[in-house]
A protein has these predicted regions:
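A helix-coil-helix interface module used to build multimeric assemblies
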Residues: 1-137, 141-157
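Glycine-rich anion/phosphate-binding loop at the beta-strand->alpha-helix junction
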Residues: 114, 118, 163-172
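Short, charge-dense linear interaction motifs
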Residues: 156, 161-164
Length: 172
């Protein structure tokens, strides 16, 4: 379905309430009544929470990769400029002579902290809400840990209400 949407073979039906109903409709058209089972042991609440976490996880991974590339470039420039001397400033005044490489490595240290923050955020965010349903779980015998592993999550939400309502990771 995603490939068909991306290629233009399929257009979103704005008559559907949201993307979840659209996907269910297309699956039902393509597979018959079994497509209606997509919603079994699922709620839009846990699906939206899942989608948001998966989206942000991918964005964090993308940003992490970009920061690593920048870090490598900064370190390479520091290596290439080990003997370049320039004035160091404090209070808008020249203070001491410093090496350009030392100045660049200050930025490398900042980028390393940023990588740590991104990693910490990813750890807290990479919790799977699937199975929380609307807010109180499901009576269907689902294997939440299996689903979480298959979707690339490190853990499952320990509390179903928190699983569908938690958005503090977005602030990070």
């Amino acid at each position: 379905i995603l490939d068909d949407l991306d290629s233009g073979k399929l257009a979103f039906d704005f008559g559907c309430e949201d993307i979840h109903m659209f996907v269910e409709q297309v699956l039902t058209q393509r597979l018959g009544d079994v497509g209606k089972k997509l919603h079994t042991a699922r709620s839009r609440n846990d699906q939206v929470a899942l989608d948001l976490r998966m989206y942000l996880r991918a964005e964090i991974d993308e940003i992490t990769g970009l920061v690593k590339e920048l870090l490598e470039a900064v370190v390479a420039q520091a290596e290439a400029n080990k003997t370049v001397i320039l004035p160091g400033y404090t209070h808008l005044q020249r203070a001491q002579p410093i090496l350009f490489s030392h100045h660049l490595m200050a930025y490398a240290m900042m980028l390393l902290r940023d990588l740590g923050r991104l990693g910490d955020c990813r750890k807290r965010m990479n919790v799977c809400p699937i199975g929380s349903c609307a807010l109180a779980g499901t009576t269907y015998p689902t294997d939440r840990r299996f689903e979480a592993r298959k979707l690339g999550f490190d853990d499952i939400a320990r509390n179903s209400i928190d699983g569908v309502s938690d958005r503090d990771f977005c602030v990070e």
